[in-house]
């Protein structure tokens, strides 16, 4: 007797649910906070933007190609397990190389402490004040480096420098510190950063002593000869690159003057990130495709659309867990390990846990090649229909603007003295608000038409960007994150709904994946490249305001163009396969709910006889 293989759908979905959950816990322990690590390395906004731009570009090109190769050679499980193992290893490598400077880690860590503790930073800072109330700060001389995270306070007046000849002076400040959003590069081996005295602010603390006056009389002429290219705002500080120094021991010969240390650090990080993304990018794409094919084989694809919920729950839990852990650690734990490295350790740990689940992950080896044909057909369909073209441009803009939030929002929060816990909570609030609104999705789709749902989503994102440019306190970001339900949820529900109406039978999912690929690949890559240079030229606030204006202009264009495009729905007969037998009734009430009858009515109403 030949035994028939049993398909345990419940077990398969349970394993897939745990896989999605733990993978997203690990992913959100690190990925949203990677930008803070790059900032502690001393990389300026343009360099960070380039790194993220290449990261998205690699994902854009490599993930679908690797998925195709895995499917062709029936090696999906091998690719999934290899991706988990190697990406965990390469990600954890950042905790050891390139090394962080302890002084800089201390100063960035210092902003997360209560304000009273911020007054006593863990390193010695030399301070001098001249007769014009220009205050100068200097880092210890034994490291020969600037403290790039030293802050210009809202009430501070004066100049920031690193001259070792300056004398120490007690400094009493009653306002919290703020961090920079720009890292200008100079050619000095020991950098100086000066800020103009803001007279008449009413908040300046006058610090004078006979010792500082004597010291500054000797330093005044040399300091006045060095002017900063940046004029400081009372609420924004600008700092030099924290890696602009004589020597940085990272195993590279720094005697070569063709590149300054900051750019050498940048090249090392860029190469590591590209390798990391090559290893990590195929994971989600291959896992999602494999699970969908498995459920398609057992006629249970309707249950595939709910698994993202567990991914969101895992992401929310991961972001809160890691930030709560990091905020409750000292700046340096055992063996002087900076607490920021725990992001990498937790990322690697959860991915290793997910690796064990991948051995049971449901995968169906199909010999059909129609999947690749559907993907090619979906990509070709992007340019064949005016409505899809307009939708593609919209999601491209959505990805470009969204990347600015992912890359630099935490910089803006850090500038107002936010701890990492508020950052983690902001992620969780955004995801959970979207998840909550999902249960009212069908009602929204009935109330609003496609164009108004897209306009609502774009408008919500524009309001968020404008709000980000005026953050005044660490907690202030939490309220606006509720709009993520509209800027990320509603707009994609509307787009997916339209794709179902427009796509040819069997290509709906492929077209939806193509649009997300366009948004989070092309759009995010372009937005990352551009946003870093905008921040360098202007500021973070200007970047978010520009994003808001761009979104409002696109809303107007979208509302004007979309109604003029042909609006004839295609009858998707493949949907009849999913119809329940109870829908085949001959009663008038059941006929009204019959999908084919409804589609025929819609088609007749769109004809002009």
Swiss-Prot record:
One Pfam family per UniProt: MFS_1_like
Membrane-topology descriptor: Multi-pass membrane protein
Biased composition (Polar residues): 207-230
Keywords: Membrane, Transmembrane, Transmembrane helix
InterPro entries, A to Z: MFS_assoc_dom, MFS_MFSD6, MFS_trans_sf
Keyword Electron transport: no
CDD domains recorded: MFS_MFSD6L
Organism domain of life: Eukaryota
Family statement drawn from the similarity comment of this UniProt entry: Belongs to the major facilitator superfamily. MFSD6 family.
Protein name: Major facilitator superfamily domain-containing protein 6-like protein A
Native species: Xenopus laevis (African clawed frog)
């Amino acid at each position: 007797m030949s035994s028939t293989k049993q398909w345990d759908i419940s077990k398969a979905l349970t394993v897939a649910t745990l896989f999605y959950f733990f993978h997203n816990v690990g992913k959100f322990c690190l990925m949203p906070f990677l930008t803070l690590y790059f900032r502690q390395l001393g990389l300026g906004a343009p360099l960070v933007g380039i790194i993220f731009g290449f990261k998205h570009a690699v994902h854009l090109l490599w993930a679908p190609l690797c998925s195709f190769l895995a499917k062709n050679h029936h090696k999906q499980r091998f690719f999934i397990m290899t991706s988990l193992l190697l990406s965990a290893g390469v990600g954890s490598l950042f905790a050891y190389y390139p090394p962080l400077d302890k002084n800089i880690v201390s100063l960035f860590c210092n902003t997360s402490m209560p304000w009273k503790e911020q007054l006593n930073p863990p390193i010695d800072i030399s301070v001098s004040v001249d007769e014009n109330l220009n205050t100068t700060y200097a880092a210890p001389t034994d490291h020969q480096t600037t403290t790039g995270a030293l802050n210009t306070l809202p009430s501070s007046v004066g100049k920031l420098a690193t001259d070792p000849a300056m004398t120490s002076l007690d400094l009493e400040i009653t306002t919290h510190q703020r961090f920079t959003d720009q890292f200008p590069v100079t050619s000095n081996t020991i950098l100086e950063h000066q800020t103009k005295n803001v007279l008449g602010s009413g908040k300046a603390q006058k610090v004078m002593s006979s010792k500082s006056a004597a010291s500054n009389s000797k330093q005044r002429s040399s300091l006045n000869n060095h002017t900063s290219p940046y004029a400081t705002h009372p609420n924004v500080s600008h700092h030099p690159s924290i890696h602009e120094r004589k020597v940085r021991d990272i195993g590279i010969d720094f005697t070569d003057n063709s590149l300054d240390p900051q750019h050498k650090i940048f090249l090392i990080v860029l190469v590591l990130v590209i390798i990391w993304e090559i290893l990590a990018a195929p994971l989600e794409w291959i896992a999602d495709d494999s699970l969908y094919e498995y459920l398609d084989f057992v006629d249970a694809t309707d249950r595939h659309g709910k698994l993202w919920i567990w991914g969101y729950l895992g992401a929310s839990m991961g972001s809160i867990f890691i930030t709560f852990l990091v905020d409750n650690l000292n700046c340096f734990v055992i063996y002087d390990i900076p607490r920021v490295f725990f992001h990498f350790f937790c990322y690697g740990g959860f991915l290793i846990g997910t690796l064990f689940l991948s051995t049971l992950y449901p995968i169906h080896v199909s010999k059909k090649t129609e999947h690749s044909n559907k993907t090619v057909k979906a990509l070709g369909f992007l340019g064949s229909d005016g409505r899809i073209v307009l939708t593609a441009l919209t999601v491209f803009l959505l990805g470009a603007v969204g990347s600015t939030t992912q890359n630099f929002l935490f910089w803006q929060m850090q500038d107002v003295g936010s701890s990492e816990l508020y950052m983690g909570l902001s992620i969780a609030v955004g995801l959970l608000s979207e998840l909550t609104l999902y249960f009212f999705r069908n009602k929204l789709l009935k109330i609003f038409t496609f164009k108004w749902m897209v306009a609502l989503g774009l408008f919500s994102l524009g309001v968020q960007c404008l709000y980000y440019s005026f953050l005044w306190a660490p907690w202030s970001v939490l309220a606006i994150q509720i709009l993520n339900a509209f800027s990320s949820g509603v707009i994609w529900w509307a787009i997916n709904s339209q794709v179902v109406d427009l796509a040819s039978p069997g290509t709906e999912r492929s077209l939806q994946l193509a649009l997300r690929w366009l948004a989070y690949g092309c759009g995010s890559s372009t937005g990352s490249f551009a946003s870093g240079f905008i921040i360098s030229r202007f500021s973070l606030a200007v970047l978010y305001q520009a994003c808001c204006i761009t979104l409002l202009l696109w809303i107007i264009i979208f509302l004007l163009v979309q109604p003029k495009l042909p609006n004839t729905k295609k009858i998707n007969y493949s949907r009849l396969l999913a119809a329940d037998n109870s829908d085949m009734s001959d009663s008038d009430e059941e006929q009204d709910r019959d999908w084919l009858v409804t589609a025929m009515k819609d088609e007749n109403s769109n004809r002009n006889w």
